[in-house]
Amino acid sequence: MENRNSSTSSRPFSVNNPFRNATVDSSINQYKNDSQFQEWAKNQSRTNSFDMPQLNTRTSSQLSFPNIPEDEPQRNADQQGAFYSGLESFSSGSLSPPSRPLSSKNPFLDDVSSATDFRRSPPPVSRNKNHPTAKEEKEQLRQRYLEESDVSTVGNTRENTDLPPSYEEITSTNGSRRAYPKEKVSRPSSHREHSNSGTYISRRSSSHHHREASSSSTPSKKGKRKSKVIVPKNVDTIDKLDVTGLFGGSFHHDGPFDAVTPHRNKNNKAAPVLAFPVDGPNSTIGGASTKKSALDEVFGRDDTDDSDIYQYSSQTLRRGGDTQDAIKANVGNVQQMDAKNKTELVHGPVTAGLGSSTFLDGAPASSAAIRNDIKAHSYHNRNGGLQRNKSLSQRLGLGGSGDSNAPMTGVRRNLSLSRDNYDVGHSNEGVRRSKTVNSPNRTHKSNYTTDFDGQDDHNEDEEDVYLGVRYNEPNMKKKSTGSKLLSRVKSLKVGRKSQ
C-alpha cells in the first residue's frame, strides 16, 4: 500500500478526476496498522468464490451441460490443482485470481499445459486408473486411425489385381490373338461398403498406368497419329506476314538488326550493331546536299548556312558530326572517308593562261609523288647561288651582240613566254626563237616551263624535268605539258598543207 500511494502521489491527477484527493483521505490508511484486519482480509481472499470454479457458470467458456459421471474425476483433479495453484499465488503476495482449469476435451490442452508448466508446479494428483487422460485418448485414436489406413491400403492392392484390362490391351495386335481375359471376381459386400474415395483414385491411377504401358508397346501408331510441327528457324514476323510466299515469289527480310523480333539480336559472340564498325567507311557518309531552287537563284535567295558545302573549311581533315571522337585513324586495311570534306588539291605545273594543273599524267598527284619528284631532281639545287646565264636576246634568238656572261636570274617571264607561244602557232621559226638554256641551278618550280630547246643543243646531257626521261638521241625533241596543245595544232596545220 505504501508503494502504491507513493507511486500515485507522484502521478498528477486531472482536474476532473473525482479521486484526486484520495491520497489525502485519512480513512483509507486507518486500517493500515491493524493486524487483525489484515489477517481477516487474507482469510477472505482464500475462501473466495473464484478459487473453486464451476463449469455451469456463465463466465465459463464451456457449455452449461449437466455434470457427466465420466468427466467427474477429471474435473475434481483439475479443481484440486487449481486450488493448490491459488494457494501458492496468495502465499507469494499476488492478489490475482488463479487461472481457470481447462476441460479434458480441449484439443489444445497439451500446448497450453506445456506453456504453463514453468509458471506453476502443482503437487501430484492421484488419478483414477479406469479413465484415460486426454493424451492417452489421443494416442488411442491415432493408433486406430493408422490401423484403418493400413487396412484400406491392403484392400487397394487387392483391388488393383482384380481390375479388368484396358481398352488398348484388348484392341492391340497381340491382344487380338490371345483370348479375352476372365471377368473380375465379385467381391463381398462388406468390403464394398468400406470402400472410400481413396480406392477410387487409386483405381484410376492404376488404369492409367496400364494404358501407358500398352501405349509404349505400340510406338508406330503414336508416331503416325501425332507428328511434331516443325517450326522454321530464322524467320521473323515480316517473313511470316509475307503473302508472296503463297505464290512462289517469297523474299527474306534479312539485316543486322531485327526490330520485329528482338530476341534474335542477342548474341554472345558479336552484337548486331557491330555489322557496321565504327572504323568503317559507312559511319562517315553524310546526307544529300540541299536542293537548288530556280526561284532562289533568280531572286538572289541563298541559304549558305544550311548547306554543308560552305559549312567547313578546306583545312578540316576529318569532320564526322557528333561521332568525330568515335572515328579513329586508319586501322589496318579500313580506309576512312568523310563525304562532307573536300580533299586538298595537289597543284602540278602551271600553264600560261590556264593556271595550275591538279592532274599529273591523267591521275591526281599525291603529296608522296611530288616529294619523290623533288628528291629525284634535288641535284639541281646542289650548287646553289646565282649563275651566269645567256642574255635575254640570245634566249629569244634575236642575234644581238651582247655580253653573254651577263648575270641572268631564273625568274620566268610570263609575258614573253606567252608571246613566244603565240608566235609558235603562226610561224615555223617560233620554236627556235623560244629556246632556252637549262642552267644547273634551276629550281624545281622553274623546270615546269613551256620553252623548247633548239636542235643545236641536242648533244648536251639534259633531262626532261617533268617526265624524268633522258633524251640522248639527236632527233628527239623535249616537250613539256604546256605546249602539247600547240604542237597538236601545228601538226594539224602541217597535215592540211600536205594534203
Swiss-Prot record:
Matching entries from InterPro entries are given as: Pal1 (IPR013226)
Principal subcellular localization: membrane
The record's subunit annotation is: Interacts with EDE1.
Q: Keywords for this entry?
A: Cell membrane, Endocytosis, Isopeptide bond, Membrane, Phosphoprotein, Ubl conjugation
Chain positions with Phosphoserine modification = 14, 45, 49, 64, 114, 121, 307
Task: Give a short account of what the protein does.
Answer: Involved in the early step of endocytosis.
Q: Please name the gene that encodes this protein.
A: PAL1
Which cellular compartments is it found in?
Answer: Cell membrane
Question: Is Cell membrane there in the keyword field?
Answer: yes
Taxonomy, top ranks, is: Eukaryota, Fungi, Dikarya, Ascomycota, Saccharomycotina
Provide the species name. Saccharomyces cerevisiae (strain ATCC 204508 / S288c)
Specify residue ranges for compositional bias: Basic and acidic residues: 133-147, 180-195
Any GO CC annotation of this UniProt entry: plasma membrane
Q: Which residues are recorded as modified (Phosphothreonine)?
A: 47, 153, 304
Instruction: Give positions of region: Disordered.
Output: 1-232, 379-499
Biased amino acid composition, Basic residues = 490-499
Put simply, this protein is called Protein PAL1
Membrane topology, record value: Peripheral membrane protein
